[in-house]
Amino acid sequence: RGLGDVYKRQALITVDKYYDAALQHVRSELIIDGKLSRDNLDKEQHAAHGLSWIAAYRATLKEMVNWAESLDKDSAFNETEQLMLQIIFSEYCAQIKSGIPMSQLEYVRPQDLGLKNGLFQENGTEEFNDLILNGNSADDRMKLAQLLKDGFSSKNFGNSNLDETTSIIRDQFRKFVEDDVTPHAHEWHLKDELIPMQIIEKMSEMGVFGLTIPEEYGGLGMSRFVDCVVTEELARGYIGIGSLGTRGDIAAELLITGGTEDQKLKFLPKIASGETLPCAVLTEPHSGSDMGSFKTRAVANGEHYTITGNKTWVTHGARSDVMMLLARTNPDEKGYKGLSMFLAEKQRGDDDNMFPDDGISGGEIEVLGYRGMKEYEMAFDGFKVKKENLLGEEEGNGFKQMMETFESARIQTAARALGVAQSAFETSMQYAIDRLNVTGQSLYDKPRNASKIVSMATEIMAARQLTYYAAREKDKGHRCDL
């Protein structure tokens, strides 16, 4: 606890200096005559990606301090939370100084960003370096390991700092998951089945699909922050369950930010109630997520647009009722400007007849994981969409409309990852406690095993606080990207 001043006054100051210097270097490499050079961005991919990691570490450490201070005000900053804060600070500061692992074989180090290690030897960094040396000791890790073990039966792995209302909502969805999802999820996965409709209907009754839709359009009007908490609990049971709401989120955000009032009134209440299941039809073969190279065409023809082209990796494509379909309405406009977004209504398919509409064909793409909604490739050959279903009833805005929704979708993706990570953590810990070695000793009693569990717990808490921060920033109307 005595290291609190180090966190706020020294460690973060040093991290800020490092980030500012890294940002200045990357800008000098990428900005030409006041504009981003795409050629230079390709050339300096490592540095640019490294900068994003440094920014994420910096924001995470700041949010961990905010988390700690908030708990402390409520006299809830106990030994578990204190050790988590101390260990994550020590570990992240050490990585910032010596190299952040961006993947198993890729690191970003100060020299990759034009910086020298002398930055970490300047006056005012003594506490930063002392924290690296002394904040993550074996004794402290074993203390936290014991606290986590003591809290295992009650699932007390540190205080996430939720208010009373949000805690009640979380507990409601946790019970739903434990009663209706967890007992069946593995069987759904092994059989590669669509999530049963009765589960979707129960989720509809609980308001999952209308959480963030305004009340005037049939939703609950809750915050992105609450949506994150709910999504984490759903994904903790089964990632497919946690992902179901994302389809509705993308569709709702598109409508709220870019739809006409008639379009909002037509679609939002049905999305909120779960009556209409949306899907996003974006990615194209050989284009990936490079929307500027999309070739699927939408040609105006009387009261309709005629869609022709191919799409792939369409999640929940067969069982959906409306597609958020991105197509090129102006072939003379290269890149992003000629794209338009459509609310393309279709009939709901099933395993026996995936795409019953005229003008659509396709098939399932088998996947190893992330099951429950299934992935599809879809071919459009003269498929008709009503002109009134052009989002915003104005051509050429599709890319802009789509990008306005991606921040919210990525925040929810982070919440899903938290749920999966929490499930993996709890499963790992249960196994380590229960499994005995040949001498009859629990695997958890081996320091190296317990230390891995400690790393999982601290990383998850840190990622959770960063995700909450991004959601709260979005709720305030702020951008939450780099």
Q: Where would I find each of the regions flagged by the language model?
A:
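A short core secondary-structure module
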Residues: 304, 308-358
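Internal helix-loop-helix
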Residues: 74, 162-166, 205-274, 316-322, ...
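Alpha-helix capping/hinge segments and adjacent helical runs
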Residues: 67-69, 73-76, 80-161, 165-167, ...
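Short, small-residue-biased leader/transition segments that mark boundaries at the very start
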Residues: 1-7
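A structural signal for short hydrophobic beta-strand segments in well-ordered beta-sheet cores
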Residues: 296-298
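A glycine-rich, basic-preceded beta-loop-alpha segment at the flavin cofactor/substrate interface
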Residues: 19-43, 348-363, 374-410, 424-447, ...
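A short, Trp-centered hydrophobic/proline-enriched beta-strand micro-motif
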Residues: 274-282
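C-terminal helix-coil-helix/basic helical segment that borders enzyme active sites and/or dimer interfaces
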Residues: 27-38, 59-93, 97-112, 185-190, ...
